[in-house]
């Protein structure tokens, strides 16, 4: 999910190798030599291994402070930054307008269909889909200017680690929780630019199939994973367009990170995922929920929610209970439901992201006033940085989290009717 806030220190290090995005169309890429391409792939794979967090000998596989975090500077991170910058610079006025207009969907909620129809007409789902495509075609590049290229702020799993390193720790915990092993096939819902999928394959040896609504991100995911030498697959697909294009019992596991607030009907989606998972397979979500302390009748709570939903790109407002109920209705057995962040808070990481992007915004606005940058940079960054501290406040008040974890399992044998 796109988290429209910011990151710690500028583009200095990258946990998984460089970003070979096709969309930026930077000329001069040298793919003419098979030997050089093989060398590039070997370098990429080595870079992934080298930049994973390392554990001290004998350390537990927990989210304590036992990890030695790799904070080394990487020139590949600068390449990602520059490519994203170029893409944003070259946006057309129509692309900017469509992105800004897409925020209208975050003032609504899937649960209020009458309001959706009143705003968008009976084909509101198609309108929401178009808005999401316009939103993600820009937000993924904005996020790539900071530490949220993967478009999510992770749970706080190590207080000493950076946002990116906490992402890696989160992804590795997912792989362990759902039992990923070489030869397994796993579905990644809302795969983004394929960076999480690449780390999952590097860490576990499993093969990932990713789906995403944004063709731009899918193209980047393809190229990135191919250059890593991974056989992962990525397809353009709206998660609300069911059934999914997969055979019954064709996957060994499923995970998603902060994509379900875009889901119109979680119950229908979970039933579809149940269909395509093999018996005994694990299902894991890490996602946005409102927590029991949130009271929609409280004016302060409601005001904060109206500010935060557009910031994090949330259409729906699910709860842990609603997700658990939908999973059980689909046939899953829920085995875990918790918040993996230390002390249940990710506010420290959110604040780091927000501080970084607000710092970038100040520089952007200065350059725009001097006519050194197109004026749409200011428009985009003013929107991106809006209400980051409201997000921090809601997390500290334990009203919401974007990192709630639920693990479920498809039974080995279907229950008797």
Q: Can you annotate each of these PLM segments?
A:
Residues 61-145:
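N-terminal auxiliary segments of SAM/dcSAM-dependent transferases
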Residues 117-120, 124, 130-179:
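Class I SAM-dependent transferase core
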Residues 183-190:
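Conserved class I S-adenosyl-L-methionine
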Residues 193-204:
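Conserved SAM-binding loop of SAM-dependent methyltransferases across substrates and taxa
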Residues 228-242:
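Conserved SAM-binding strand-loop segment of SAM-dependent methyltransferases
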Residues 242-254:
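A short acidic, Gly/Pro-enriched loop at the edge of an enzyme's catalytic core
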Residues 267-282:
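A short glycine-rich, Lys/Arg-flanked "PGG" loop and its adjoining helix->strand segment in the class I
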Residues 297-298, 303-403, 411-412:
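Substrate-binding/catalytic lobe of Class I Rossmann-like enzymes that use SAM or dcSAM, i.e.
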């Amino acid at each position: 999910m796109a988290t429209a806030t910011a990151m710690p220190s500028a583009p200095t290090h990258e946990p998984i190798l460089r970003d070979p995005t096709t969309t930026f169309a930077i000329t001069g890429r040298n793919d003419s030599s098979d030997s050089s391409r093989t060398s590039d792939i070997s370098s990429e794979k080595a870079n992934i291994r080298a930049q994973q967090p390392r554990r001290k000998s004998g350390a537990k596989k927990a989210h304590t402070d036992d990890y030695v975090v790799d904070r080394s500077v990487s020139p590949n991170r600068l390449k990602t930054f520059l490519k994203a910058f170029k893409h944003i610079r070259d946006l057309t006025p129509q692309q900017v307008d469509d992105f800004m207009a897409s925020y209208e969907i975050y003032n609504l909620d899937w649960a209020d269909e009458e309001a959706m129809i009143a705003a968008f007409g009976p084909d509101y789902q198609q309108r929401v889909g178009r808005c999401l495509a316009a939103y993600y075609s820009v937000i993924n590049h904005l996020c790539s200017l900071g530490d949220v290229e993967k478009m999510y702020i992770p749970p706080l799993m190590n207080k000493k680690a950076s946002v990116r390193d906490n992402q890696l720790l989160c992804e590795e915990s997912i792989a362990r929780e759902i039992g990923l092993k070489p030869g397994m096939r796993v579905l990644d819902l809302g795969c983004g630019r394929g960076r999480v999928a690449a780390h999952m394959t590097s860490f576990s040896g499993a093969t990932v199939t990713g789906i995403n609504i944004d063709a731009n991100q899918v193209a980047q995911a393809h190229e990135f994973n191919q250059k890593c030498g991974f056989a992962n697959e990525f397809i353009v697909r709206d998660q609300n367009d069911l059934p999914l294009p997969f055979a019954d019992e064709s996957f060994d596991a499923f995970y998603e990170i902060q994509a379900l607030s875009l889901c119109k009907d979680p119950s229908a989606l979970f039933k579809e995922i149940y269909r395509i998972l093999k018996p005994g397979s694990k299902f894991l979500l890490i996602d946005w929920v409102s927590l029991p302390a949130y009271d929609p009748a409280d004016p302060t709570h409601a005001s904060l929610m109206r500010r935060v939903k557009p910031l994090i790109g949330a259409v729906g407002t699910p709860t842990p209970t609603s997700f658990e109920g939908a999973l059980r209705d689909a046939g899953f057995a829920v085995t875990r439901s918790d918040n993996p962040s230390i002390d249940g808070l990710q506010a420290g990481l959110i604040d780091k992201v927000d501080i970084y992007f607000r710092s970038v915004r100040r520089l952007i606005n200065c350059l725009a006033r001097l006519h050194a940058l197109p004026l749409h940079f200011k428009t985009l960054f003013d929107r991106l940085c809006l209400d980051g501290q409201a997000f921090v406040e809601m997390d500290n008040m334990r009203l919401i989290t974007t990192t709630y974890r639920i693990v479920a399992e498809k039974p080995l044998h279907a229950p008797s009717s």
